[in-house]
């Protein structure tokens, strides 16, 4: 069971809504993933339409919506988008995203911290997408963010946990949930994140662009479950030396 702010989730896999070939495939994949928290970009939602092709099926699916501020380049733009989301969707939950460079989509640490502090004061439950910077994640936690979402690699790159060393520090020092976001390309990456102590992962591109998104979503669900179970089972420590699993000393002496 994962608790963030005032909500609990059975699934430790969060999903996105971008890049799917159709809204039907999006919903089928989300259901197959078992995800209960789904993020959507406010820039992709037509708030003038009650039957928006993205929003309506998500509401029907009964998932918790996590609107994001993707597209915002400054704290001011993100704060404006956050208020639009709260008014339109009736939720104070927000994935804070500020990335001024459209090529790399790397989060702006200064603007993110600035916006996070303001939004928390305004009553939002803020989950910030950020770089894998232990100092920044601690600062975001201190200003009241409900979780931190450091990247594993650039958005949509499918490179995996390129920031593993920093993620380990973030996880070790955090007192709020850590959700590894961005760069997760295959289910084994998700399993590794849970094994190393992350509370959840957010996956979008790897599922949406797969040849079979529904089955890929299932694979991610199983991988996250396996990674969590492995961590809870207490894996053995790594060693530089070999350790025999079946000592042969007694057997050899008895045969002599």
Curated annotation (Swiss-Prot):
It holds the Pfam family ThiG. Its EC number is 2.8.1.10. The active site is at 95 (schiff-base intermediate with dxp). One of its GO terms (molecular function) is thiazole synthase activity. The keyword Disulfide bond does not apply. One of its GO terms (biological process) is thiamine diphosphate biosynthetic process. It is found in: Cytoplasm. Disulfide bonds: none annotated. It is an enzyme of class 2 (transferase). Homotetramer. Forms heterodimers with either ThiH or ThiS. This is Thiazole synthase. The lineage of its organism: Bacteria, Pseudomonadati, Pseudomonadota, Gammaproteobacteria, Enterobacterales.
